[in-house]
């Protein structure tokens, strides 16, 4: 069982607090001197009290930034203040629990995130212990998410760790790969924040592409009537699909993760003004005026099932195109 997980729409007030780099506190007048020695700054004062602020600690700021990213990306359910709590024995309500810094659920994916930071760049001698502990929750977390928030299909469980100023060794990276835990650092986080600011919830599927390379997502399978043709040495398919599904299985371009120039590439390819004009055109005319070219990565993501047709086998062939995100 998962505790402290809510519908995202119920967390608007929390989202405002987490989106800020500072924390705020209202205090009585006699408390002000002590608070000032603890690093609080006086914002405004009245006859009976005052409002103070101070920068968030780095560990708090990292968790809040990661949580805010998932909120901006449109996850349906998110952990509340203090993270989520996973019961290690679902049959015992008062049994031991595992705290998870950030949890996000959407129709395809359930993600459990731990956040690790340091005040200055350094190695963490216990990082592999953290990896092992996080890896142990995978099955319980997946079962709890799918049982408490059921769907016609099971979500894919993703375990990730966001780090800030932690220096990871080759052994750390290898152990994370063995545990199938995604490692992302402060540069990756900044990249996704910029991408989310530019694309909004659509950036979620770029995150999925990076967290789940080659992973089959059961909620993202569909079949379409299609025509198969040849263009030089390449096999091509012509088909129609809903924009919502295309968005989930496609991303705009390959990139080297975490580089600012990749966001610049997105901004050139998908300008907000251009997107607005396209949206207005579709809204007014009900059609998209041109084809979209999609490149499939390998044979595992596409399967063409030929149908009977009259005439010879030369030229175009009619059939069913089976697509899946993987």
Please give the residue ranges for each predicted region.
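Charged, often glycine-rich, active-site loop that binds/positions anionic groups
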Residues: 88-97, 303-317
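Short, well-ordered loop/turn elements at secondary-structure boundaries
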Residues: 98-99, 107, 287-289, 317
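A sequence-level detector for short glycine-anchored, His/Arg-bearing signature motifs
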Residues: 316-326
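N-terminal extension/subdomain marker
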Residues: 146-289, 298-301
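Intrinsically disordered, low-complexity Ser/Thr/Pro/Gly-rich regulatory segments
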Residues: 1-216
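Glycosyltransferase catalytic domains, chiefly GT-A lineage
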Residues: 114-116, 283, 294
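Short acidic-glycine loop/turn motifs at beta-strand connectors
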Residues: 106-108, 296-297, 306-308
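Short acidic/His/Gly/Ser-rich catalytic and metal-binding motifs that mark active-site loops
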Residues: 121-123, 301-304
């Amino acid at each position: 069982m998962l505790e402290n997980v809510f519908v995202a729409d119920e967390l608007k007030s929390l989202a405002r607090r987490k989106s800020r780099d500072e924390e705020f506190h209202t205090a009585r007048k006699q408390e002000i001197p002590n608070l000032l020695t603890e690093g609080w700054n006086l914002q405004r004062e009245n006859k009976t009290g005052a409002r103070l602020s101070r920068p968030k600690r780095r560990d708090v700021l990292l968790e809040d930034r990661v949580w805010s990213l998932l909120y901006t990306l449109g996850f349906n359910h998110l952990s509340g203040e203090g993270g989520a709590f996973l019961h290690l024995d679902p049959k015992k309500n008062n049994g031991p629990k595992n705290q998870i810094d950030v949890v996000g659920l959407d129709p395809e994916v359930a993600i459990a995130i731990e956040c690790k930071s340091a005040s200055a760049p350094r190695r963490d001698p216990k990082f592999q212990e953290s990896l092992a502990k996080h890896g142990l929750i995978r099955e319980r977390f997946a079962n709890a998410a799918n049982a408490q928030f059921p769907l016609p299909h099971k979500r894919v469980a993703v375990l990730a760790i966001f780090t800030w100023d932690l220096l990871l060794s080759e052994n750390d990276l290898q152990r994370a790969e063995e545990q199938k835990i995604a490692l992302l650092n402060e540069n990756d986080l900044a990249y996704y924040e910029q991408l989310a600011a530019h694309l909004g919830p659509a950036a979620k599927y770029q995150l999925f592409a990076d967290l789940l390379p080659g992973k089959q997502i059961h909620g993202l399978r569909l079949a379409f009537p299609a025509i198969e043709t040849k263009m030089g040495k390449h096999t091509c398919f012509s088909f129609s699909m809903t924009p919502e599904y295309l968005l989930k299985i496609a991303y705009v371009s390959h990139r080297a993760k975490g580089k600012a120039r990749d966001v610049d590439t997105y901004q050139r390819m998908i300008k907000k003004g251009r997107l607005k004009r396209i949206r207005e055109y579709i809204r007014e005319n009900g059609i998209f005026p041109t084809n979209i070219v999609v490149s499939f990565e390998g044979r595992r993501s596409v399967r063409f099932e030929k149908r009977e047709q009259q005439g010879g086998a030369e030229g175009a062939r009619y059939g069913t195109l089976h697509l899946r995100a993987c």
